[in-house]
Curated annotation (Swiss-Prot):
Job of this protein: Catalyzes the transfer of the enolpyruvyl moiety of phosphoenolpyruvate (PEP) to the 5-hydroxyl of shikimate-3-phosphate (S3P) to produce enolpyruvyl shikimate-3-phosphate and inorganic phosphate.
Name of the molecule in the record: 3-phosphoshikimate 1-carboxyvinyltransferase
Superkingdom as given in the UniProt entry: Bacteria
Gene name in the database record: aroA
Protein family membership: Belongs to the EPSP synthase family.
Involved pathway(s): Metabolic intermediate biosynthesis; chorismate biosynthesis; chorismate from D-erythrose 4-phosphate and phosphoenolpyruvate: step 6/7
């Protein structure tokens, strides 16, 4: 079954059982191919996510003159050209749906000697980019956006960049990463501070590639002029993808699943803390480290959940997992309150509105507010859901269908392939009632 089908029909299946291997982490895969391309020497990447977003990033570096081999779907061998070895592209660089790819590439391309244009699909073309282009402009970059600050990004090369001390107004790992990557090319030191700590994939991986970088929660700094050394990277399983099965096993009676070698970056796992507040039964085992990233097996067993107030401090550490959390909240006894999550309105869709509207269509009472919502737990009924082409909305309602009193039709599911190719077949094998329709 292909994720490119038009819609899914989700309905009650069986309890989830057994051991599951989740595809590689999207955030780590993006950075691995990017940093390997900028390194001196050849790097091997194992566990690479073969999704549309990550393929877009790899294809862009091929357009920039980097040779990338594909021995298997989950492997890449990248022949790095060094920080100063990228070549002018022959046309626009298409990021597809990948906000990570576009924002991080803006930081790299701002320092090149040539001009370039970054474009994206209809969803990415609506997303805010001034949060990246403004600090890059402070460093001396010249990047043009549309009048409303959206893509395409027209990057003018040949600019001399200066290091800056940047206090980011938003808690965004993508913004931080773009500034740090530009900082590699800048004169002097570049430092970034954040209102709340965000994921530190960039900092950890730059360190793995030999860059001297100082970082702690909410702070990072590096000096310009450094080079990257090739290294091999083992990409852990993607926590954001695992999140859908973590929630499903938590709310489907009788479930007991183990998810293998899941990335547990401490700035990524807010969902685990939130679900544990709600009474979830989640046990970590076999802790290890892959490419600077902590990993572990997660055993998740069904447990009756109760509503909870989600601490705002957890929000940056679970920003991509809120669609799954909303489904857990709908299945819980009592009310779950989410605040401080306005960033959800500028993701691949307005996720607050999309989840609130979808849950209401299934009979759940949701009080929406500008930066969050209160979800009143209840019984999930039948309905038709518009995913708005957002992969995480689509997968969240595939879970909701597992507790539905009838069927849930989830429309516009093609973009699931951007982050989780094979989601539907893996879900079916685990026990989901899920079928594809044209």
């Amino acid at each position: 079954m292909s994720n490119s089908t038009q819609h899914w029909i989700a309905q009650r299946g069986t309890a989830l059982q057994g051991s599951l291997t989740i595809p590689g982490d999207k955030s780590v895969s993006h950075r691995a191919v990017m940093f390997a391309a900028l390194a001196d020497g050849t790097s091997k990447i194992d566990g690479f996510l073969e999704g549309e977003d990550t393929r877009s990033t790899a294809a862009i570096f091929a357009q920039l003159g980097v040779r990338i081999e594909t021995p298997s779907a989950s492997q890449r061998i990248v022949h790095g050209v060094g920080v100063d070895g990228l070549q002018p592209p022959q046309g626009p660089l298409d990021c597809g749906n990948a906000g990570t790819g576009m924002r991080l590439l803006a930081g790299v391309l701002a320092a090149q000697r040539f001009d370039s244009v970054l474009v994206g699909d209809a969803s990415l073309s609506k997303r805010p980019m001034r949060r990246v282009t403004d600090p890059l402009a402070q460093m001396g970059a010249r990047i043009e956006t549309e009048s409303d600050g959206t893509p395409p990004l027209r990057v003018h090369g040949g600019q001399a960049l200066q290091g800056i001390t940047f206090a980011s107004p938003v808690a965004s790992a993508q913004v931080k990463s773009a500034v740090l990557l530009a900082g590699l090319y800048a004169t002097g030191e570049t430092s970034v501070s954040e209102p709340h700590p965000t994921r530190d994939y960039t900092e950890r991986m730059l360190s793995a590639f030999g860059v001297e970088i100082a970082f702690s929660p909410g702070q990072a700094r590096l000096r310009g002029g450094q080079r990257l050394r090739a290294t091999d990277i083992a990409v852990p399983a993607d926590f954001s993808s695992a999140a859908f099965f973590i929630v499903a096993a938590s709310i489907i009676p009788g479930s007991d699943v183990t998810l293998r070698a899941v990335g547990l970056n401490p700035r990524r796992t807010g969902l685990l803390a939130a679900l544990r507040l709600m009474g979830a039964d989640i046990v970590e085992d076999n802790h290890a480290e892959h490419g600077g990233e902590p990993v572990a097996d997660l055993r998740v067993r069904y447990a009756p959940l109760r509503g909870a107030q989600i601490p705002e401090a957890l929000v940056p550490d679970m920003i991509d997992e809120f669609p799954a959390l909303f489904v857990a909240a709908a299945a819980a006894r009592g009310d779950t309150v989410v605040s401080g999550a306005a960033e959800l309105r500028v993701k691949e869709s307005d996720r607050l509105a999309a989840m609130a509207t979808g849950l209401r269509a299934l009979g759940i009472v949701v009080d929406e507010k500008p930066d969050g919502a209160t979800i009143h737990g209840g019984t999930l009924g039948s309905g038709v859901i518009e995913s708005h082409g957002d992969h995480r909305i689509a997968m969240a309602f595939a879970i909701a269908g597992q507790l539905s009193t009838g069927t849930v039709q989830v429309n516009d599911v093609a973009n699931v392939a951007t982050s989780f190719p094979g989601f539907d077949s893996l879900a079916q094998g685990a026990g989901f009632g899920l079928s594809a329709r044209p």
